[in-house]
Curated annotation (Swiss-Prot):
InterPro entries: GPCR_Rhodpsn, GPCR_Rhodpsn_7TM, Olfact_rcpt. Residues 47-54, 121-139, 218-237, 293-314 are cytoplasmic. The gene is OR9I1. It comes from Homo sapiens. This is Olfactory receptor 9I1. It comes from the Eukaryota. One of its GO terms (cellular component) is plasma membrane. Odorant receptor. The lineage of its organism: Eukaryota, Metazoa, Chordata, Craniata, Vertebrata. It is found in: Cell membrane. Glycans are attached at residue 5. CDD domains: 7tmA_OR5-like.
Length: 314
């Protein structure tokens, strides 16, 4: 019996939707709709930025990478959810689970760093608009983006290595809809204390460090805006940050609830809802957030729409 208990698992069973079998078809349609809208919105945003010369600025350069991350983010998770809901197959191999966790962690970590970079970019634009493109030159922009990806990949390697060096024995049922850190730690049969300290400390550091950069950037932005004499000028200047503030509030709010809040006051169902929100809903909302109140993006979209209309009418 002891020997059986120590057998290493080769696959996991995702139990996230097992409690609601009657909702499988409606959930499939909802997740499929969200996924298609997310891909259309984010890929469309990337293409729009590439084809319109007016959007060749640091702000939209960073936004194109945010859209790329969001498209990848949801593509790591949602196809697995759709396959589970469509086929009823809840089994995921050990290697697939590790790969999903690794890719998901890369996207989440990189997005944290990128949102901090975008906050600094907004400060640079507001502090000295005339020298904005000089200060945020292409070399610096690429360095910041590459730095965000390197930090995201490095963090993912650390978290994945720590998590999957744990022993997973007889119990292989993950009460979640994808391979995320909290349910995997609960499932491990080896001592997780030391590894949890490393993972949680690093994760908290990444979230809090980037949140601090964003907070400092916006404090400096507010300080700069207060120097503007007209109230209309202050409102117009601050409105350029509204989309980014909304995206930051949604993303970091979900991460803080999920990973920084004490687990004693949370239920697993709450974790599932929040996970759906930041892995599926937020990537779908970001293109809308950045385009609805953005005149440049709306003008570029109208221009492309007119070109398509002309080409189709010929």
């Amino acid at each position: 019996m002891a020997k059986n208990n120590l057998t290493r698992v080769t696959e996991f069973i995702l139990m996230g939707f097992m409690d609601h079998p009657k909702l499988e078809i409606p959930l499939f349609l909802v997740f499929l709709s969200f996924y298609l809208v997310t891909l259309l919105g984010n890929v469309g945003m990337i293409m729009l930025i590439q084809v319109d010369v007016k959007l060749y600025t640091p702000m939209y350069f960073f936004l194109s990478h945010l859209s790329l991350l969001d498209a990848c983010y949801t593509s790591v998770i949602t196809p697995q959810i759709l396959a589970t809901l469509a086929t009823g197959k809840t089994v995921i191999s050990y290697g697939h689970c590790a790969a999903q966790f690794f890719l998901f962690t890369i996207c989440a970590g990189t997005e944290c760093f990128l949102l901090a970079v975008m906050a600094y970019d907004r400060y640079a634009a507001i502090r000295n608009p005339l020298l904005y493109t000089v200060a945020m030159n292409p070399r610096l922009c690429w360095s910041l983006v590459v730095g965000a990806y390197v930090c995201g990949v490095s963090g993912a390697i650390l978290r994945t290595t720590c998590t999957f060096t744990l022993s997973f024995c007889k119990d292989n049922q993950i009460n979640f809809f994808f391979c995320d850190l909290p349910p995997l730690l609960k499932l491990a049969c080896s001592d997780t204390a030391n590894i949890e300290i490393v993972i949680i400390f690093f994760g908290n550091f990444v979230i809090l460090a980037n949140a601090s950069v964003i907070l400092i950037s916006y404090l400096l932005i507010i300080k700069t805006i207060l120097k503007v004499k007209s109230s209309g000028g202050r409102a117009k200047t601050f409105s350029t940050c509204a989309s980014h503030i909304t995206a930051v509030a949604l993303f970091f709010g979900a991460l803080i609830f999920m990973y920084l809040q004490s687990g004693s006051g949370k239920s697993l169902e709450e974790d599932k809802v929040v996970s759906v929100f930041y892995t599926v809903v937020i990537p779908m909302l970001n293109p809308l957030i950045y385009s609805l109140r953005n005149k440049d993006v709306k003008d570029a979209f109208r221009k492309v729409a007119r070109r398509l209309q002309v080409s189709l009418s010929m």
